[in-house]
Amino acid sequence: MPKFKDVYAVLPVSEHSAAVAWYERWIGRRPDTEPMEGVAEWLIAGNAGIQVAHSPEAAGKSAVVIVVEDIDDTVGSLGARGVECGAIQDYDFIKLTEVADPAGNKVTFVWENPNYRPSTADD
């Protein structure tokens, strides 16, 4: 089995500059690297990152799920930066909210309930 080192979610965009500005706003910093023209990368957790890539033909057709420590704090922090999330959806085992980037790619923020216990046949 291969030993994986890093994971990047690639989000294709049609307007690279606008997308980079939008991601800078909610991530709170400039890209960590711009390895080539039309590509910007942010390391957002451990060895996981987001890559915004200029690719107009694929723009708006991707999605990424980001697990957060506090969904309410995340929504509040993003709102303070001008990034409005959808309503928080509560499914007992998770809470989530979604937002679309300027290209239409879906970014879903998820909080996992550490106290959730699924019902069993014995319940």
Describe each model-derived feature in a short phrase:
Residues M1-V20, S62-V64, N113-D123:
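N-terminal beta-strand motif that seeds the catalytic metal site of vicinal oxygen chelate
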Residues K3-D6, V10-G49:
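Core segments of cupin and vicinal oxygen chelate
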Residues H16, V64-K106, W111-R117:
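Vicinal oxygen chelate
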Residues R30, I50-V52, E84-A87:
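A short linear hydrophobic-aromatic micro-motif
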Residues R30-M36, Q89, P114-Y116, T120:
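Conserved catalytic-core motifs of GNAT/GCN5-like acyltransferases
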Residues M36-V39, A58-G60, Y91-K95:
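Short acidic/glycine-enriched loop/turn segments that link adjacent beta-strands
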Residues G46-G49, E57-G60, D70-D73:
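Short, charged/polar surface micro-motifs in flexible loops or helix N-caps
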Residues N47-Q51, G104-V107:
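Short, charged/polar, Gly/Pro-enriched secondary-structure boundary elements
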